[in-house]
């Protein structure tokens, strides 16, 4: 199975003409993140048959030199956003791994699908592309991974991500849930939740290579 087949199935089910129109106009007249060629990087860097973990984000960062198509990731050399800083703090506490770049391309190459629920945003306007059609697309992506793949770990941080839990077949996948790593909620159960070691324990138990959470590749 390839992402192209999945995309084809989704486009058979939904008409994205309206969304395509909105995006066409937005990219022509506004600053939109990520750059157009980076919108689908999550799928480019993590082929369908390599997906071992899915981490769901909300929408892309809306500042310059941040979003590049992977949830939570920022371009190398960019200051770490607060949620990502907390993710790294938990990684260090959990597995004693220190990372030196905010770019998560290495995770993507390891088999971690870093999927935002909405894949584009207008610069400086959080959630500006909510409701234009991306949610249908990402819902179908989660369903497809659940349906066609085996023993995938779905990491759902925060209420919006956890709304997708009902789409996941828990008889053949693992779901890890906690509050969001945002500074607003991290101390209410994200810190100490050990999502990285939990993920690797599950993968090893199902004869899969664990994720190298310290891997750093630059796009």
From Swiss-Prot:
SMART domains, alphabetized: UDG (SM00986), UreE_C (SM00987)
Catalytic residue list: 59
Entry keyword set: Cytoplasm, DNA damage, DNA repair, Hydrolase
EC number: 3.2.2.27
Top-rank taxon, per record: Bacteria
Record bears the keyword Metal-binding: no
GO biological process, one term: base-excision repair, AP site formation via deaminated base removal
Keyword Cytoplasm annotated: yes
UniProt function note: Excises uracil residues from the DNA which can arise as a result of misincorporation of dUMP residues by DNA polymerase or due to deamination of cytosine.
HAMAP family: UDG
The protein's name: Uracil-DNA glycosylase
Name of the coding gene: ung
């Amino acid at each position: 199975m390839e992402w192209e087949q999945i995309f084809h199935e989704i486009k058979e089910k939904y008409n994205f003409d309206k969304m395509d129109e909105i995006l066409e106009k937005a990219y022509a007249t506004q600053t939109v993140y990520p750059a157009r060629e980076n919108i689908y990087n999550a799928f480019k860097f993590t082929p369908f048959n390599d997906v071992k973990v899915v981490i769901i984000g909300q929408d892309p960062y809306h500042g310059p030199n941040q979003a590049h198509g992977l949830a939570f990731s920022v371009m190398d050399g960019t200051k770490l956003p607060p949620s990502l800083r907390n993710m790294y703090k938990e990684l260090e506490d959990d597995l004693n791994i220190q990372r030196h770049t905010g770019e998560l391309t290495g995770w993507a190459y390891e088999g971690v699908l870093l999927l935002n629920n909405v894949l584009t945003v207008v610069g400086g306007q959080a959630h500006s592309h909510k409701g234009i059609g991306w949610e249908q697309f990402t819902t179908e992506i989660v369903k497809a991974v659940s349906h066609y793949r085996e023993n995938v770990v779905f990491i759902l941080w925060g209420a919006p991500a956890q709304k997708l839990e009902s789409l996941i077949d828990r008889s053949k996948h693992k779901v890890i849930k906690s509050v969001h790593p945002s500074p607003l909620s991290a101390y209410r159960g994200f810190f100490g939740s050990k999502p990285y070691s939990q993920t690797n324990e599950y993968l090893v138990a199902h004869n899969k290579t664990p994720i190298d959470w310290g891997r750093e590749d630059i796009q």
